[in-house]
């Protein structure tokens, strides 16, 4: 007597499952192109930090505003990393230029028009 072993019929192909998503907090430029496929685009925030390059007197570097923006951004990313159910937060490269026509007479100032910004 031959006993038949029950077999499961092969499954039919179904629609491809959506890729698993993950949360990432950090610098946009640190990701590889394929990493963006794993991000939930509906729960991702891109932050564009701006920091004017302008004089702050003879005793401070022109990068003060950019340095402050970078510090605030680092703190915000740290808070996002510690937060539950937080969307992905990706920081774009800091743009070290702003609208600074009042500083135009000082050497080293970088300024864009308000229309350009």
Regions flagged by a language model, labelled:
Residues 6-117:
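N-terminal catalytic or cofactor-binding beta/alpha core of small enzyme domains
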């Amino acid at each position: 007597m031959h006993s038949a072993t029950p077999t499961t019929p092969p499954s039919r192909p179904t629609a491809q499952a959506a890729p698993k998503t993950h949360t990432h907090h950090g610098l946009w430029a640190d990701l590889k192109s394929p990493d963006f496929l794993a991000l939930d685009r509906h729960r991702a925030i891109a932050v564009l930090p701006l920091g004017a390059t302008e004089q702050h007197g003879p005793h401070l570097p022109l990068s003060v505003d950019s340095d402050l923006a970078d510090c605030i951004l680092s703190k915000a990313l740290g808070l996002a990393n510690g937060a539950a159910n937080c969307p992905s937060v990706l920081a774009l490269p800091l743009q070290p230029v702003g609208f600074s026509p009042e500083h135009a007479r000082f050497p080293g100032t970088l300024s864009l028009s308000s229309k350009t910004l």
